[in-house]
Amino acid sequence: MKKFITSALPYVNNQPHLGNIIGSVLSGDVYSRYCKKKGEVSVYICGTDEYGTAIEMEAISQGVTPLEICEKNRKLHKQVYDWFNIDFDYFGFTSSATHTGLVQDLFMKMYDNGHFSEVEIEQFYCEHCGLFLADRFIVGECKFCGDGRARGDQCDSCGHTYNSLELLSPRCSICSSSPVVRATTHLFFDLEAFRPSLEELYRTNGHLWSQNAQNIFRQWISMEFYPRCMTRDLKFNWGVPVPLEKFKEKVFYVWFDAPIGYLTFLKELVGEDFGEWCKDAELVQFMGKDNVAFHTVIFPAMLYATGEKYPVVRRLSATEYLQFENEKFSKSRRHGIFGLDLVGGGLGKSCMWRYYLLKIRPESTKDSNFTFSDFRQSVTADLINNLGNFVNRVLKYIQSKCNSRVSLLELDSGDKKCIEDVNELYCKYKAKMEEIKLREALQVVMEICRRGNEYIQEGVRSRDRKGHFFCLGFSIIGLVGTLLHPFIPVTSLEILRMCNLEETMFPESMRIVDGHTMGSDIRPLFEDFTTEQIEEMKRYDRPQSTGCSK
C-alpha cells in the first residue's frame, strides 16, 4: 500500500522554532526517508498554512497585506527546512487557487449532504475597529484555567476550545477596547452525526497512534459534540470564500480549510493519479499534541461528510512539547532558538541539530527540554567520541595497515557473536522505526556503534587477528551508514563515501564485506564546537531578537 505522509502545516505568520521543527517536519522527514529506504511507494507532503486571523493581525500590525506577509514568511520557512535537509516530495501553500477550488468543492459535497446548518449567533464586535472579533482578534481570560492570554477559539495554556463569548474580560486584540455583542449568521458543521464513524476509526486505527494521541481522542470522544462554526467574518476576508450567495462576504475558518491542504498538495503533486491515491493510500501524520483533536476528530468527520473516499488517518505520531532551558518557547519574549538563528551555521552544522533534536524528541507522554549544555555534551559524547571515533578509527587503520583493502580471515565464535549482537540490534531498530519511536531507534544506532567499538577494542589485544577485527568492523560501519540515513542523511552519505560503498535499501541483515577497497579520502565526521560558536550559544542565555515578526 502506498504511504501518504504529512506534517502538520506550519503557520506562516512566523518562522518555526525548534519545537515546531521536531514536532512535525523533522519527524516526518525521518519516517519518509525510512519508508523510501525500505522501497515503499510513499510521498512526503507539507506546506504553509496561510489563512486565518493570525495572518490578518500580523498584516494590520505591519501595515501590509496578508498576502505580503505570506509571501515573505513562506520563503523563510522553506529556507529553514532546506537548512535542516528536510526532503519534502512537495511543499505547497494554502493561498493557492487549487486549494480554494478543492476546499469549496469538498464543502459543497458536505453542504449538499445536509451536514451544515445556518445559525444566527451573537459575537463580539469592536465598534472602534468596525469588525467582528473572531479567534485571535479577541483575547481574554480562560474560564477553565484563568490564563489571561486566551484567544477567541482556544486557550493555548490549557488546550480547551470554546465559544468566544465564554471568554472573561474580553478585549479587542487590535485596539484593546471592550467589545459589544452583535448578531451574525454563520454555517455550523454537525460533528455529532459522525460520532459512530469516529469511534470505528479509533477501533480500527487507534492502536497505531502515539499514546498521547490516543489519550486526547478518548477525552474528546467522551464529551458531547456541539455543532462547529466553520465560517468567519474577517477584516480582509483573508481566507477561502464561502461559495454560497448568502455567505459571500464570509470565509472559512482556518481549521476547516487548512487540513484540506494535505489533499490539495497531494493533488498538485500526483495530478491525474489523485483519485487512486485517495482510494488506497495509508495516511501517516506527524504533529504536536495540540493538533491531535483536529486531525483525529474534526478533519476525519469532514471527510466522512463528503460521502466520498478520501484517506483518513491511519498512523499518527504526536509529540509533547519541547521546552527551551526549562521554559516555553516565546516569540514575544525572544526566548528560544528559531529557525533563522541556525541557518548561518554559527551554532553548529545541521547534522548536529538534527541528531540532538531527534535524541530528545518528546515522543512519550512527557515534555522534553533543550539545553545548550546537554546539546554540546551530546555532540561530544555521541557524535564525536562514539560514532565519529568508531568510524575514523576503523577506516584509518584499514587505510594505513591494510592498504585500504578490507580482507577477512575465517570467522570465529567471537566474530559470530558480534555479528549476532549487531543483527539483534538491527531488528530492534526496524521494530522501533515501524512503531515510529524515532528517538528509541536512534538510540539503537548508537548502541550498534558502542558494540562496534567494544569489538575493535578486543581486537587491539590480538596480535595475529588485529587487522581482521578492524575489517569486520568495516561491515558494522557500512550498516551504521545505512541506518543513519533517515536521521542524519549528510553524515550517512559521508560514511558511505569514505567506505566506497553504494547507497542501498535496508538489507535483511548486516552485509559482511570482504575483498573490498575502501575510499582514500578519510576525514573526521564531526568537529567540536569552536570558541566562536560557544560564545554565540551564550547569547541565548538572555533575551534575543529572533529576527522574525512578532
Curated annotation (Swiss-Prot):
Origin superkingdom: Eukaryota
Residue ranges of the motif 'HIGH' region: 10-20
Reaction it catalyzes: tRNA(Met) + L-methionine + ATP = L-methionyl-tRNA(Met) + AMP + diphosphate
Database matches in NCBIfam families: metG
Entry's EC annotation: 6.1.1.10
Keywords assigned by UniProt, alphabetized: Aminoacyl-tRNA synthetase, ATP-binding, Cytoplasm, Ligase, Nucleotide-binding, Protein biosynthesis
Principal cellular location given in the protein's record: cytoplasm
SUPFAM superfamilies assigned to the protein according to its UniProt record, in alphabetical order: Anticodon-binding domain of a subclass of class I aminoacyl-tRNA synthetases (SSF47323), Methionyl-tRNA synthetase (MetRS), Zn-domain (SSF57770), Nucleotidylyl transferase (SSF52374)
Cellular compartments annotated: Cytoplasm
Similarity-based family: Belongs to the class-I aminoacyl-tRNA synthetase family.
Gene Ontology MF: a single term: ATP binding
Keyword ATP-binding listed: yes
Motif mapping: 'KMSKS' region: 328-332
Protein name as annotated: Probable methionine--tRNA ligase, cytoplasmic
An example Gene Ontology biological process: methionyl-tRNA aminoacylation
Entry annotated with the keyword Transcription: no
Binding locations of ATP: K331
InterPro entries reported in the protein's UniProt record: aa-tRNA-synth_I_CS, Anticodon_Met, Met-tRNA_ligase_1, Met-tRNA_synth, Methionyl/Leucyl_tRNA_Synth, MetRS_core, MetRS_Zn, Rossmann-like_a/b/a_fold
Organism in which the protein naturally occurs: Encephalitozoon cuniculi (strain GB-M1) (Microsporidian parasite)
One of the record's GO cellular component terms: cytosol
Taxonomic placement: Eukaryota, Fungi, Fungi incertae sedis, Microsporidia, Unikaryonidae
